[in-house]
Amino acid sequence: MAAQQRDCGGAAQLAGPAAEADPLGRFTCPVCLEVYEKPVQVPCGHVFCSACLQECLKPKKPVCGVCRSALAPGVRAVELERQIESTETSCHGCRKKFFLSKIRSHVATCSKYQNYIMEGVKATIKDASLQPRNVPNRYTFPCPYCPEKNFDQEGLVEHCKLFHSTDTKSVVCPICASMPWGDPNYRSANFREHIQRRHRFSYDTFVDYDVDEEDMMNQVLQRSIIDQ
């Protein structure tokens, strides 16, 4: 049991910089960067969501996205799943405690959490307005595998699906890196799975940049609630 917990922690530490400061980081899948859903432990000891693992197993010679060892079907991580069901966390809005497995459904309807998100958006916009206007290109992106560039989000997803389906190299997501919250040094454990899950459509689908600040924040808030 202890060995399994250590392995789960090892996978989470590689899930991203936030995991180091987040005590719940050990419950984070290194592929989708979400709380494990139906966690499965593979032979090398690392853990993935069941759906993420199925995608990782699709290449002819699949490898673990964390340690790059040969990847094979694993076994259900029953103890980790039990911990997710029994570990408590607090809502950032109302401060009430919920089990980790229930927090998403709660924040979708918590008005105080919605206010918390709104204040965060306002603070981000205010801070950005004080910075020099050096806005990165967020409309076209280079392929992280080859010299091809000028893809929109959908085009990059399709390009990688067609021409890089067998590439296993860890690369930086150019879409995430261009965003204010993105880490330009973080290498995705499975980039193709990452963009297919996270960037299936453009951010322009969600935000109209021509509307005023208040309307834009409301749009972002509503979309974040829908996507919970």
UniProtKB/Swiss-Prot annotation:
A zinc finger (C2HC RNF-type) spans 91-110. SUPFAM superfamilies: RING/U-box. This is E3 ubiquitin-protein ligase RNF114. It comes from Pan troglodytes (Chimpanzee). Keywords: Acetylation, Cytoplasm, Developmental protein, Differentiation, Metal-binding, Nucleus, Spermatogenesis, Transferase, Ubl conjugation, Ubl conjugation pathway, Zinc, Zinc-finger. InterPro entries: Di19_Zn-bd, RNF114_RING-HC, RNF_E3_ubiq-protein_ligase, ZF_C2HC_RNF, Znf-RING_euk, Znf_RING, Znf_RING/FYVE/PHD, Znf_RING_CS. The modification N6-acetyllysine is found at K102, K112. It catalyses: S-ubiquitinyl-[E2 ubiquitin-conjugating enzyme]-L-cysteine + [acceptor protein]-L-lysine = [E2 ubiquitin-conjugating enzyme]-L-cysteine + N(6)-ubiquitinyl-[acceptor protein]-L-lysine.
